[in-house]
Amino acid sequence: MIAILLAPVYLLANYYLLRRVMGWVKAWFPFFRTARHWALPVAVQAFLACSIVIAFFLPEGRARRVMKLIGNYWLGVLLYVLLAVIAADLLRLLLGYVLPFKHIFVTTQMHRIAGCVCALVILIASIWGVVNARIIHVTPYDVTVDKTVEGMDEMKVVLVADLHLGYNIGEKQMQQMVDRINEQDADLVVIAGDIFDNEWDAVEAPETIAATLRSIRSKYGVYACYGNHDIEEPVLAGFTFRQSEKKESDPRMDEFLKDANITLLRDEGMLIDGKFYLYGRPDAHRPGRGIETRKTPDEITAGLDKDKPIIVLDHQPKELQELADAGVDIDLCGHTHDGQMFPGNLTIKLMWENACGYLQKGKMHNIVTSGVGLFGPNMRVGTKAEICPITIHFAKN
């Protein structure tokens, strides 16, 4: 429903973009002033604008994958084209009509210059966004839990999240992630949800990816919880349509994790090696198959030995105070992507108490990672893909 309501806005944005770009082209090439010369630019614009819709309705296969990738790249480019063109228009309005500089700024020559500057900014932002999205950084944290653990003064946990295996992310990105993880000599590796990108059939060569993930080295193994995208649900430009149906993961997703030697925690916890608890929560909005309502923080810790460290894995950084009050020591999350693309990296901070990074709530440490993968536009601008090795220091025995 939201996608349908926003469709006119999307169409208007593309129309506005076409008018402004063609205005700039005409400033350089006067023969584009006639309507018949608009045919090719209009056709290209229409193809790019409709690519996400075409991909949505195509059957699974190579054509759909290509159209999906084109659409995802276009969404990212469109954002920066709109930002650049709107900024140029506002500046032109200010300098040419509000301030007394019309004779300087409202000219064909200035139109050409403004267009070239916009094109350069768009090109740099888009290329950097694509390249930057493929570079996985290492963001370390150190926290202290005031509890003793027999035979252990510290432990290294590597947090990753938001793999989004599908059209954007495949084996190459996973191999880089595994290489970064294995450099850390981890005691424990955890994946805080959104392993998949809504559609199982979008995962290319799942057997190869599972084999790559099996090569993760960790003393206590690899554990995961599901996120809001770990369900089988067609998505159009980030929006879904089957609102009345219960959202569930494809059983093949579960089998994939088993094949990858990843233990899925679905509203359940484990006492690992008799030393610490690890609890994996289902997603707050889409708990998935067989779970109607996830357990509350108090229900999670009820019956646990609170003299032992309690680590919670939760896709979305929610209920932070409640988890702290319930006795949780460390809460590890993802979901936000840190906004993924400017200006989202600024606005995301208005939506979450901890949009990315570290926050302490009472005695609890909350860490939110920006994730490894991507959702929607195949770019990262102003954010980074990352893994987070967390060194947990315990009280001395």
Where do the language-model regions lie?
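Short, functional N-terminal and low-complexity linear motifs
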Residues: 40-42, 57-59, 108-110, 145-149, ...
